[in-house]
Swiss-Prot record:
Binding site for substrate: D91, S92, G93, G94, Y95, D145, Q189, G216
Entry keyword Zinc: yes
Pathway membership: tRNA modification; tRNA-queuosine biosynthesis
Name this polypeptide is given: Queuine tRNA-ribosyltransferase
Role summary: Catalyzes the base-exchange of a guanine (G) residue with the queuine precursor 7-aminomethyl-7-deazaguanine (PreQ1) at position 34 (anticodon wobble position) in tRNAs with GU(N) anticodons (tRNA-Asp, -Asn, -His and -Tyr). Catalysis occurs through a double-displacement mechanism. The nucleophile active site attacks the C1' of nucleotide 34 to detach the guanine base from the RNA, forming a covalent enzyme-RNA intermediate. The proton acceptor active site deprotonates the incoming PreQ1, allowing a nucleophilic attack on the C1' of the ribose to form the product.
UniProt xrefs under InterPro entries: TGT, TGT-like_sf, tRNA_ribo_trans-like
Family membership: Belongs to the queuine tRNA-ribosyltransferase family.
Span of the signal peptide: none
Region (RNA binding): 247-253, 271-275
Source taxon at top rank: Bacteria
GO cellular component: cytosol
Enzyme Commission numbers on file: 2.4.2.29
Protein keywords: Glycosyltransferase, Metal-binding, Queuosine biosynthesis, Transferase, tRNA processing, Zinc
Length: 374
């Protein structure tokens, strides 16, 4: 077993735990920065270690296309290639393939697609994506699944569940024949139909995965449906395994995920928003492109202890964004990931102290408001 619960909130499903990945221990709930192509944009491995991150995410689709498995095999995996010394999770690449629209085609045992880079043709199967992730050398591998659009009707959702469940069974059989130190997580689907969700959760939970992931949420559905599905499944999840909510990284969404028993999160939003001039602070979201910060000599967040806020004024960082300097992206990204790390630590501490709902209300109030304007 790779997961152990260490404390539980008495009023919600929130909990803390320890996730053990080949000797690397992580406290949960945990947020994973996204390094799609083998790097968290604008940051080095040293930066991530300085920020005390121990788990990041890579993307199988992109790493398969470039640099490719032959390069990864030669280096002994992505971690040696990139000198990342901590843990790595890779998604299966299925979501990216299905986002290609006309460039992919379902088959019984996989999906054919054309590269978005050069139009070359490729074929992903449940087995092949495990092989690719073995070349990548991730500590957690994700199975190939079929994520239907959130507004799909019953027929399309049924197709999604049938594929997802069939591919999950194939993945488990293949993985168990050639087990190594890599862990495998299953993914359940069902869109915003709670009956389909519970059916899929039951099927995926019945298989011997190391962890269970919620797929196909936060893909454009109304927020009330996002909350409804989380609430509806929370009483039915396996509390002996880690629960991973894929692609979720806003402050309100993380809070609602934790409230409903989620242990793991990933999202490009903190890094992407940083590059677009939005930073997360203890006062709320701030738009660095706002004219009002032009001459401000205060830090982006007066309560922040990161090296960026200790050294630079918000006026200076706004200037760097305004003139398009690359350094603006790295400084803002560093700050946002520092914020996320502290935010998750505060959540962990609040659960252990029995104060989660107080923290929940505090951050919800701050982050469901418009941007902070001083």
């Amino acid at each position: 077993m790779i997961f152990q619960t260490t404390s539980e909130d008495t009023l919600t499903k929130a909990r803390t735990g320890i996730l053990n990945l080949n000797g690397i221990e992580l406290k949960t709930p945990v947020f994973m920065p996204v390094g799609t192509r083998g790097v968290v944009k604008t940051l080095s491995a040293d930066d991530l270690e300085e920020l005390e991150y121990s788990l990041i995410l890579g993307n199988t689709y992109h790493l398969y296309l470039r640099p490719g498995t032959s390069v990864l095999d030669r280096f002994g995996g992505l971690k040696k290639f990139s000198t990342w010394k901590k843990a790595l999770l890779t998604d299966s690449g299925g979501y990216q393939v299905f986002s290609l629209n006309s460039l992919f085609k379902y088959e019984q045992d996989g999906v054919r697609f054309q590269s978005h880079i050069d139009g070359s043709r490729h074929y992903f199967t449940p087995n092949s994506v495990i092989d690719i992730q073995r070349s990548i050398g991730s500590d957690i591998m994700m199975v190939l699944d079929d994520c239907a659009p959130f507004d799909s009707g019953p027929e399309r959702l049924k197709q999604s569940l049938d594929r997802t469940h069939r591919w999950a069974e194939m993945s488990v059989q293949y993985w168990e024949k050639n087990k190594n130190s890599q862990h495998l997580f299953g993914i359940f689907q069902g869109g915003i139909d709670l009956d389909f969700r519970l059916e899929s959760l039951n099927t995926i939970t019945s298989l011997p995965f190391d962890g269970i992931a919620i797929g196909g949420l936060s893909v454009g559905e109304p927020r009330k449906d996002f909350i409804r599905i989380l609430d509806g499944i929370s009483a039915h999840t396996d509390r002996n395994r880690p629960l991973y909510l894929m692609g979720v990284g806003t402050v309100p969404d993380i809070l609602d995920g934790v409230k409903n028993g989620v242990d793991m999160f990933d999202c490009v939003l903190p890094t992407r928003n940083a590059r677009n001039g939005q930073v997360f602070t203890t006062l709320g979201k701030i738009n660095l492109r706002n004219e009002k910060w032009k001459s401000s000599d205060t830090p982006m967040d007066p309560n922040c202890t990161c090296k960026v806020c200790k050294r630079y004024s918000i006026g200076y960082i706004r200037h760097l964004h305004h003139v398009g300097e690359i350094t603006a992206f790295s400084l803002s990204t560093y700050h946002n990931l520092h914020f996320m790390k502290n935010f998750l630590t505060e959540i962990q501490n609040s659960i252990q102290k029995g104060e989660f709902l107080e923290i929940y209300a505090k951050w919800k109030n701050l982050y469901e408001k418009p941007e902070f304007s001083g």
